[in-house]
Amino acid sequence: MSVRPLSTPLRQAVKHLRSLHSLSRRSRPLNPPQCLRQQHRRAGTFTTNASSLFRQNPISVSLAFLAILAGAGGLGYANYLYKTYITAAFHNYPEPVAQKLRRALYYTNTELNAQEAIKYYRQALQVAQEVGMDPFSDEIIGVKVQVAKLMEEIRQMGKAVQVLEFLRKDCLEWLRQAGEQEHNRVKRTRILAKVVGISVKLGELYGSPEIYQRDLAEERLVWAVETVLKERQRRDTIRVTEGMSEEALVEVEGPWMTDSETGAALEALAHTYEEKDQHYLASPLFLQALNLYPTKDCHAVVLMNNLASSLAQQSPRAAAAVDAYASSATITSLEAPTGPVATRESLIQNASTWAQKALDVAATVQPPTRNEECDIGCAVATHNLAEFAEMMGRKEDARRKYVEAISIARAVGFEDGVENSSARLRGLAGFGGRGGKHTKVDAPTG
């Protein structure tokens, strides 16, 4: 029996198996460590290229990097501005009203076009009425005040006055009809404070050179001051009689004007009386306003200087009643006061005392609280002390103070002070020159 025939099929089978094992295989994937090493190599290549690029073009690469940072920062800041000044500014308005106001403010603040701005303000007020907004809300009153402000900015003082007078009239009518209702107590306080502010602004506008109606200015300011003082007295009476704390009173009646706001109304009326040379009325108002400011405040320096100037320019008879006016709750008469006649020397001495107090207070105020009012106030107070010394016949003291005032004014960049003190010094030395009225301080603007 032969076994030879089996060898061929076996060899063929083995050959077939070998052919199966010889099929092409896919390359094995990189294991995880190899992948990580490859990524590191690529990262290293990028870092190397960046370093090489920086070495070749250090300025260009730095500028490009700064430009990218600036662009990213600009986008972030633009988003902040949009949310803060575009969206948040109008969140109390219904969207149809807000749309009109955005256009109005664009033509007010960005591309000044009074005609277009007024058109959109009117449309905003019309839409506000249609959607049922309260015409005496802070938002609607604010729109009307903004219209008056726009008129003032383009020097249309008459139209600004007209807008504010209409607004004042409407508010007073609401106070007359609904202000005494029990459920309107908080709203009454808020609207009354608005009318006081509007009246003070009207007093300022009536006193502007474009209009210059001093009687109307005085009328509006007297009303504002009397209203402020009467309301303060009324609230004090309620607090005492009902045994309420200030917090409880605010909850029931609403917040009233701050001391600073009250002082501003008193000061505005005082300046009006000064312009009319009614210093016996201006002095107590300056004194009352001063009592409402903290002793270490730069504006207190301004008030002390103006009080000193006003005292020095009073007639002796009128000065006798200053304290009575200062302690009164209301201003009830514009007639000249009567009483024992003060001497000229006592008036000047009182004025000197207040000027020196202004210097003492200014010396205690340090940055960041200290501002331009303190710096200019020092120059003015020193100049006034020189004038008071000159009026009392103390020529050498006056000369020394004038020189000191010039030095202070020059150091703080107060050119008017340099000019005024230099003129008085020349007059004192007998080289000519004319002195004017006593220097007073106005709060710096801008």
State the predicted function of each range.
Residues A128-G132, C171-A178, V228, R232, ...:
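Alpha-helical junction/boundary sensor with strong preference for TPR arrays
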Residues A300-G446:
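Fungal C-terminal region signature
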Residues T87-L281, L285, A300:
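Intrinsically disordered, low-complexity juxtamembrane tails/stalks of eukaryotic membrane proteins
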Residues M1-S60, G446:
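N-terminal mitochondrial targeting presequence
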Residues T47-A89:
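Single-pass hydrophobic alpha-helical transmembrane segments typical
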Residues V250-G254, L290-D297, T364-D375:
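Acidic, serine/threonine- and proline-rich low-complexity regulatory regions
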